[in-house]
């Protein structure tokens, strides 16, 4: 149970923290002595000590014995990024594989980029009903974060410190942010579709099926783009070859692909795009059940989140997004906002699609 510090202690720590955040005490700068702080705030030695202990625990300062107390070289408001997931990963509510890739690579990034620290929050309950959500709100209000990266559209957090606290840069990995002060980090799914179709065309495929989920390529505009891309390449499809599944029930991809590709069908696709990596494993099982030989009977292009692509027992061409690049774009955007660079109210930054063979094979992790 976390208790609130006494009022005077809290006021001292808040004021010193504010002065560090505003740059009155730069990273590495020495703070006034304890005696000077006692006089300035008209408080006791123990009150000053506990206020400084609190700031040290938060990562803002550190003591050097008799040499005094100094601002940390990498204080949290400049170096600690909050990576926010909507909920915990659980059997009842499993994470999409994209979130798992981001989570895994966030901690690795700390090791490869000294001076950057990632704090992970796995509950964004706007009502603060969990300890995790309360920790998020407290960290934001105390400016213990350089900025926030939301792995989802955070509109339900309107009215909470997570979106309303001033001076906190924010980005959201989303198709459309639509929120003032939140930069949208967008994955270039349009080029993913184009490059997938290019691969199938290069392999001589003419009849293409698409299997996707409700969050991507599921709108009427997406379907029109798919048909236009096929027409541009002299390819074709059928209305019932465009299947949209529930991302939370990926196991049904097995039956879907078995139905599409079994030898009882009069016409079968010779190219399949599996547009979400949560479906890949089950879709591959469906192709095997249908007796499809890959690549003799059909070519398969599968979405993946690198460097953690979904395993497949079939030879598939993978393309998708590198979680490391996504995180770097997010953190760089936060840094730009913190430097005061102009950011439009609904600014966007894009992450480009990559083929698996465009990455170093040594970077690929077992999914």
Which stretches of residues belong to each language-model region?
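Amphipathic helical "hinge" segments at domain boundaries
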Residues: 10-14, 22, 34, 75-139, ...
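An alpha-beta-alpha
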Residues: 196-235, 345-362
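Hydrophobic alpha-helical segments within soluble ligand-binding/sensing domains
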Residues: 12, 183-211, 219-220, 225, ...
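N-terminal helix-turn-helix DNA-binding module of bacterial transcription factors
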Residues: 1-77
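Flexible loop/turn connectors
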Residues: 15, 254, 258-367
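Flexible loop/hinge segments that line or gate small-molecule binding clefts
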Residues: 151-192, 278, 304-316
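Periplasmic-binding protein-like
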Residues: 82-84, 144-152, 209-213, 264-279, ...
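Short beta-strand elements in bilobed, periplasmic/extracellular small-molecule ligand-binding domains
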Residues: 109-127, 209-210, 227-254
